[in-house]
Amino acid sequence: MKLGLSKENLSALTLAATLHDLGKTRISIGKPGKLTAAEYEEMKRHTIYGYESLKNILGIPPSIALTALQHHEREDGQGYPLGLKGNDIHHHSKIVARADVFHMMSSNRVYHQAMPFYKVIEQMNSDMFSKFNPEILLEFVSRLMSTLVGKEVRLTNGRIGTIIMINPYDSLKVLLKTSKRIIDLRMEKEWQIERIIGE
């Protein structure tokens, strides 16, 4: 991997990603709507609950519990629960944070609808030098887009096409094949990828 993870670290990261929201099992809030300020503060404590549940389990690396604690921390110190910055945040926590936010923005939730795919990527890019580590973000987007070759997508104009090539310099400006022609989104400035079909 470009992020320099050994097989051992990758295995630990996989487990950390699987368990990062374990603390939510101790949260009893299940309302189908926007949380009150008090409810939101309680929801934020899932990071601490997860850490407390994992930190003393024998046989798992300390990074697993740290990821549960830190996956809502941000590079600029505006995250929670500790307001950590930059190098004070564990590397695995930074990677899981990026994937967690992508999943949140691109999924339907009781309190918001999924954002169009292109808006998710644009928002991620805008956060590159503030909330998230730029190296991790670039690697995440690169690997994400590479998995979409051969996938069907719906454009903002309603057309459906299959991605056949990714532009390495502008990830959203892909080359697509529709039933009638090839579309190069570098040339079609007003068209964007709205969603991945089947995702």
Annotated model-derived regions:
Residues 1-198:
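Histidine- and acidic-residue-rich, metal-dependent catalytic cores
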